[in-house]
Amino acid sequence: MFKWLMSSLCGIRNSTSPEVYEPIIGGQNPATMLRLQSALAAVNALLPATLTIEDVISSADNTRRLVKAQTLARTYQACQHNIECLSRHRASSDNPNLNAVVTTHMINAKRLSDTCLAALMHLYLSVGAVDATTDTMVDHAIRMTAENSVVMADVAVLEKTLGLDPQATVRAQDLLALNSGVLNSVNAVAEMTDPTDDVEFTQSVHSPLLPRQLSTTEVVGVPSPVKSNLKSKHKPKRKASLVAV
């Protein structure tokens, strides 16, 4: 109190004032409740056990934890969207440098998303707390610069802290690239073969699947009667001959 009084009399103000959290009363501020519901929806989509507004507003620590968790959840969703967009890239020999850049971005985005998810789980489901490393992760997640080497170095530290295996991500990306290459090869073979050619090849003019069309030069032959080897028991009747008078 005395320090505050002396600083006020001398005109000295503390520029780095600590954050102040006011208690939230449900129904008093609709905008605040809407932001809380939006944050809970983003976080509950990744947590196995859903949180409620009562859990969040019960203490200032829970509110601060929700703010960190919302940033981690938004970053995870953004990384997943980037991975989905980058996976549509078709690797080609025309621009090999672009293929390497896309692969690097996919690996970094996958590592960042896995780290955000693990930090979020550790924030709510672990017994201990890693507030320092989580705060660092949140600061980097806000900047969203996964391609930066400094950020990826901090991600590597968090991976070691949270027990993640980045090599598994690289192997998964290699398997995805292999499956994409096989699918592209199958599609290329399918495009080279025309379905109409297959029909004409399997059902030609002489194919039993189609009726044979006669040309103008062919002569239609009348089938001759087949002589039977069986002898009839009845005697053939003789025709009456005409006698000229």
Curated annotation (Swiss-Prot):
A lipid is attached at C10 (S-palmitoyl cysteine). Phosphorylated. It comes from the Viruses. The keyword Nuclease does not apply. Residues 225-245 are annotated as: Disordered. Residues 230-245 have a biased composition (Basic residues). Keywords: Host cytoplasm, Host Golgi apparatus, Lipoprotein, Palmitate, Phosphoprotein, Virion, Virion tegument. Its main location: virion. One of its GO terms (cellular component) is host cell Golgi apparatus. It holds the Pfam family Herpes_UL51. It is found in: Virion tegument; Host cytoplasm; Host Golgi apparatus. InterPro entries: Herpes_UL51. Plays several roles during the time course of infection, including egress of virus particles from the perinuclear space and secondary envelopment of cytoplasmic capsids that bud into specific trans-Golgi network (TGN)-derived membranes. Oligomerizes. Interacts with ORF55; this interaction mediates ORF55 incorporation to virions. Belongs to the herpesviridae UL51 family. This is Tegument protein UL51 homolog. It comes from Equine herpesvirus 1 (strain Ab4p) (EHV-1). The lineage of its organism: Viruses, Duplodnaviria, Heunggongvirae, Peploviricota, Herviviricetes.
